[in-house]
Amino acid sequence: FRRRICEYQERTGIDLMQLCFEQLAGKHVHLLKISGKCVRMDSKLIGSNIARQSRYELIHTTLVKFLKTCTLSDLSPEQEERAKEYLKEDSSKTVYRSDSDTLQSNLARIGNFIMEMLATFPATSPAHDLLQRLFDEQYAVKDGKAVLRDKKEVKADSLQNPNDPDATYRAKNDQKVQGYVTNITETVEEGKPNIITSVLVETAVFADCHFLQEAVENSERVTDSTIEDLYADGAY
């Protein structure tokens, strides 16, 4: 069911779940005679259901995901052997057993191998695109070699886990999340239930203030009235 909904949205640009939500919310607003002129909104970080990975684990698992889509016999004997080594490797054990110097050496080695793989195989798959993204975020190329970037250069919207490419990193107050941020808007009217009129979801790095206009437009469409008062915190 979810797959068919997503395929329909990709094909037509119409979000059926959003339409269904707005119709139901609108009927409740009308039934309960809620004016919709006063609303409040707030955001909340949502963690993705992904494992937190060390830098080496992230790079290794993304490479492995790519190698599983490749025909390894197209590689040179040396490259094929190294590819099979990475496919067999448990990256969490590698990290656990390695000291800092060994890990840095492994990161440099795997970076150069990734550069070779990207040059060898054509960019015809999502796995290739994901590996290219990871390489660009984690490495720079100097004198024909892959050089690991300083951690400070890696942005919050960089790949967190290849199993959820859209998840990003954000620290908000005391909360640190790899995932998403959702913005909820609801009606506020004394003596009447609060009806949710807008639910927006973006990657975690999305700023709260950027939700404002779309959330207001969604709410006004659902309630069929113009918002006069809006309660929100300073981030908006």
Feature-to-residue mapping (PLM):
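Polybasic low-complexity intrinsically disordered regions
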Residues: 1-228, 234
